[in-house]
Amino acid sequence: MISYEKLWETMKNKGVSQYALIKKYGVSPGQITRMKRNESISTHTIEMFCRILDCDVGEIMEYIREE
């Protein structure tokens, strides 16, 4: 499974709130909800978060092996 838990940590470290993502950067609340639920999102959305947060993909998501 893909986990976006690292996203919330990176946002905190960079001082970017969910409110800022929505209001300043135009991220839809639905995208944020999908990431909170670890649901699938597009590569475009992943790229957008990397640009906004000035980070690498590994700083916002990780693969967790399900057993």
Region spans (language model):
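Residue-level detection of the helix-turn-helix DNA-binding "recognition helix"
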Residues: K12, G26, R37, R65
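Short, basic-rich loop-to-helix N-cap that marks the start of a DNA-contacting helix
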Residues: N38-R51
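Key DNA-contact positions within bacterial/archaeal DNA-binding proteins
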Residues: Y19, G30, G58
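Residues that mark the N-terminal boundary/hinge immediately upstream of a DNA-recognition element
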Residues: S17, S42-T45, D56
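Recognition helix of helix-turn-helix/homeodomain-like DNA-binding domains
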Residues: V27-I41
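Short C-terminal boundary/hinge segments that cap the last helix of small helical domains
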Residues: D54-E67
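A short, Lys/Arg-rich alpha-helix, primarily the initiator
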Residues: M1-A20, K24
